[in-house]
């Protein structure tokens, strides 16, 4: 990643720490993955704090595929089968079946309805019957070990919200341009500045975790 593009958001360490602070303050962050991977920017929010306004922003400026990142433990708690048994996607993106809140929604498509579904799925006492299948929210199962085991947006989301002090559940959606094409670093940075969001890379997060875990060992 061209570090000059990201210089307005601080050093790699500062970018991670600013992202954690933003999440703690109920704001979203933008996460860029590696240029030789998807080379895309995702909007990321803590599931516990996401607002209807933030969901509306996500739907308006994103791909429309609003994903709920979960751990394997939560997937099992909710009894969510994986979408396919043989995952042949390029980056092994681990979708489960889609979900909808069993109560409190209409068609399930609106920002309010999608947020109701997310809140139902991440509630401490959530049970399988709280969710209908299929629906308009796309759960993603994160790999154990986070970005140190897979350098994906799913794992970055779980790492960031956990490090910020929230339960390991976060919402992501890929940022798109007005013409429907995928947003890359220059467009992601412009969007972040327009919406007072900080930007970091998965590479930043990998280095941050490695440094802190080496200190702890």
Curated annotation (Swiss-Prot):
Residues at which D-ribulose 5-phosphate binds: 37-38, 42, 150-154, 174
Gene3D superfamilies found in the cross-reference section: DHBP synthase (3.90.870.10)
UniProt site (Essential for catalytic activity): 136, 174
Class of this enzyme: lyase
Cross-referenced Pfam families: DHBP_synthase
Annotated GO CC locations: cytosol
S-S pairs: none
SUPFAM superfamilies given in the database record: YrdC/RibB
Transmembrane regions: none
Substrates-to-products reaction catalysed: D-ribulose 5-phosphate = (2S)-2-hydroxy-3-oxobutyl phosphate + formate + H(+)
Chain positions recorded as Mg(2+) 1 binding sites: 38
Reported cofactor(s): Mg(2+); Mn(2+)
Origin: domain of life: Bacteria
Keywords, in A-Z order: Lyase, Magnesium, Manganese, Metal-binding, Riboflavin biosynthesis
Family: Belongs to the DHBP synthase family.
Function as written in the Swiss-Prot or TrEMBL entry: Catalyzes the conversion of D-ribulose 5-phosphate to formate and 3,4-dihydroxy-2-butanone 4-phosphate.
Protein name, UniProt field: 3,4-dihydroxy-2-butanone 4-phosphate synthase
Highest classification ranks of the organism: Bacteria, Pseudomonadati, Pseudomonadota, Gammaproteobacteria, Enterobacterales
């Amino acid at each position: 990643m061209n570090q000059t593009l990201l210089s307005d958001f601080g050093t790699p360490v500062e970018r991670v720490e600013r992202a954690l602070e933003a999440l703690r303050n109920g704001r979203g962050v933008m996460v860029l993955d590696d240029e030789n991977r998807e080379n895309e920017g995702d909007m990321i929010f803590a599931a516990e704090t996401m607002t209807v306004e933030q969901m509306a922003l996500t739907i308006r400026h994103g791909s429309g595929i609003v994903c709920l990142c979960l751990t394997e433990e939560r997937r099992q708690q909710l009894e969510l089968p994986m979408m396919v048994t043989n995952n042949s996607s390029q980056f092994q993106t681990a979708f489960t079946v889609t979900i909808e809140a069993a109560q409190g929604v209409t068609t399930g498509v609106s920002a309010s309805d999608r947020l109701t579904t997310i809140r139902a799925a991440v509630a401490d006492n959530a049970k399988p019957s709280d969710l209908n299948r299929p629906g308009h929210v796309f759960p993603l199962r994160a790999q154990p070990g986070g970005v140190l085991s897979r350098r994906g947006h799913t794992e970055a989301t779980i790492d960031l919200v956990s490090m910020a002090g929230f339960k390991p559940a976060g919402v992501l959606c890929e940022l798109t341009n007005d013409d429907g094409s995928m947003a890359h670093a220059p467009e992601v940075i412009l969007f972040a500045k327009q919406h007072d969001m900080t930007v970091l890379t998965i590479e930043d997060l990998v280095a941050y975790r490695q440094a802190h875990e080496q200190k702890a060992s």
